[in-house]
């Protein structure tokens, strides 16, 4: 079993194109997959500032430069996006880009989709207090389990922000595994709360 190479396909956040683009292919070829869900997405509360930043950037470099300024600013990300683009969050865009709970339920009912947690609000856990970290972990898990009637045992660190303290909180929050967004292959004996992935984006 362990001599065979295996691939696990997973998505973070909860964008609707998982349902519209990827799910039909997974159904056709019977491919299992995991969604690490940020519960603000289907709840209609997510401020998808990076999508709106793309719409207000004139080039890939402009987008990347603005993105770096946002991450380096230390201010709330949506607030900094607003400052850079002079544009308020458009929640209609956010809702249209996000999965709905009904779409998630349909994917679960296919028998192919496993749901994990990716916090409530996609906060970088190393940048918030221990109390806020626990809230993000417990409330997202609870929300998913109550809405979808599934057990949530897997977690993905937003922005891959993880340290020993955050990892300890995750381990004490009822999860069995936690993944980063990068790092490469997973091998036998790897830390189950620091599992690596290969990050794939569209060209």
Model-derived features with residue positions:
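Active-site beta->alpha N-cap acidic-glycine motif
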Residues: 1-109
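C-terminal active-site subregion of NodB/CE4 polysaccharide deacetylases
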Residues: 1-10, 16-19, 48, 110, ...
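Residues that flank catalytic or metal-binding motifs in active/ligand-binding sites
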Residues: 31, 121, 191
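Residue-level detector of anion-binding/catalytic polar loops
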Residues: 32, 114, 176
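Short beta-strand segments
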Residues: 37, 116-119, 154-159
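Feature marks short, surface-exposed loop/turn motifs that line or immediately flank catalytic pockets
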Residues: 41-43, 123, 158-161
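Histidine/lysine/aspartate-rich catalytic loop segments that bind and position anionic ligands
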Residues: 99-104, 108-132
């Amino acid at each position: 079993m362990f001599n065979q190479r295996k691939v696990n396909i997973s998505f973070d956040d909860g964008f609707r194109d998982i349902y519209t683009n990827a799910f039909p292919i997974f159904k056709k070829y019977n491919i299992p997959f995991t969604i690490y869900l940020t519960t603000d997405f289907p709840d209609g509360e997510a401020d998808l500032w990076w999508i709106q930043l793309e719409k207000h950037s004139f080039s890939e470099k402009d987008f990347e430069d603005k993105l770096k300024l946002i991450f380096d600013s230390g201010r709330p990300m949506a607030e900094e996006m607003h400052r850079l683009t002079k544009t308020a969050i458009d929640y209609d865009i956010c809702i249209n880009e996000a999965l709905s709970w009904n779409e998630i339920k349909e994917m679960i009912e296919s028998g192919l989709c496993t749901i994990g947690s990716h916090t409530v609000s996609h906060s970088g856990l190393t940048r918030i207090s221990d109390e806020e970290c626990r809230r993000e972990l417990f409330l997202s898990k609870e929300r998913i389990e109550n809405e979808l009637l599934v057990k949530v045992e897997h977690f993905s660190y937003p922005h891959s922000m993880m340290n020993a303290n955050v990892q300890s909180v995750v381990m004490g929050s009822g999860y069995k595994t936690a993944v980063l967004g990068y790092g490469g292959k997973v091998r036998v004996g790897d830390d189950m709360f620091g599992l690596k992935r290969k990050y794939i984006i569209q060209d």
